[in-house]
């Protein structure tokens, strides 16, 4: 078994989408970074890697047994054993995983560039390890939706832009739940004032679909201003907005 030593990790907890497990250049000063004193390194087929990276489903039992209590975290000069923690790669992507004692990848982290390079060197002549796992299980059953955007809708965005776009769709989802035609007319007009006359005879659902389809693509200053207006007067959303404005990348 391969092992990595002195691995810096920045855990993102409960993230089913790999795009929210930020790469090193997007780590922030307020993130909590830990040092893994030792952790197993596994090379797996791409289908299993993507399943681990982009889901929160059961990990293969054989994989868990193989890494059981083989990782240590160092805190305040103390070395503590972890139940199921490992770094996994398919030779292209790399991700660290800590199940915090469960059998699903609860916490995920990217590695720092120097350690990513070391992983590539260590696995370049290693065959991917196949674990006893039903192929059907690897077919992720999850579906992307308004509160879990598909990767193509956040591709190319910075961490801050991804977070604010997801915040905007949380607010839009709330708007959808209200089913208030006057409100959806107001917000669609805010987004696209040139369409005011055309939407007068449209139903709530038709206007909602147009707003969703027009805001889901890309990201711009227009999106940013729309989101800021949409969340005004809603303390929970405003708090999330403020947290993103205050965050600083290392």
Swiss-Prot record:
Belongs to the UPF0736 family. This is UPF0736 protein RBAM_011410. InterPro entries: UPF0736 (IPR020909).
